């Protein structure tokens, strides 16, 4: 048995979904262990192009069991909508290949309202939320003010619990934000429309995972976002509200005894960021727009233009350490093929001193990038399938990043399709 975690090294949007889709050929189970509908894992295969938000990226592989673990922000409305979308494209989803932990907490209708209302209140001080209710959800979870998925099987207790939560939440909605209150009729409609649809998929996934582990099954843990958005290790407060690191995978999946054998850290060949907060190596103007256009850098969930810049060695090295990555997948190398000279942020200039260490979040606003330039290769590399197929300049770019971040780059993605990959 071998267990693997696929995690983001930077701000998210690195290409984790395409790597999960590729590597699930060797795994029996795929588990999403944190985050919620704010994710956007893009997968392109023979069935089309998919932007997965809650569903694990292993759903396209026959024989793979996909699990939403207890650490996930389980949004029944978004999940059921997403399930319908992928099933309409010929993807089979049954309780045999998709299982939802009965210990996952439900993202309730007012969580999205609270998210949007708080961003409106913050105005120009906003965090850049996707407005999917993630921060209010996790806040309520740690206050023990949510519903567990398993409670859907206990209707009377569920309605009493919901009524108590509604009374409490309506105080905040009406008194703090001046918004309309919820009614039980609204919540009962939500239960019927969405929760009843996902109910057949809810079970004790902890037992399933323990059995899988005992029987020598290979388990892949799929993370959302990246190291720099981790609640504890990221650029606080411009983080998500969950732990995005591989170390959290056993807890959030429901298999605390799991040993992670390999951690594949996914790094984009340049930097992108959605949302607010410090982004030291950010490009602006025409240079940024050209990179954004060539990489099609728009949020899979929000459609927002992503902030872009050169690969940031300082931030990436920090991300590798936070994830304890054992190997790296470098994605979207092909996007840089238009550049004559390729910029790389190798150090930061902070308080008149050059540093290669990622600083405390409060210091980042004063950091300036130190840029080196590498020769571009100026040719189409999307057909490369072996290391020798890549031009020398591309090889030098990859090996420089590898040396600087201190972790071997095993996979190099040269296109969005499943087979557009170089394995070293």
Where does each model-flagged region fall?
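Non-transmembrane, aqueous-exposed alpha-helical and coiled segments at domain scale
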Residues: 1-424
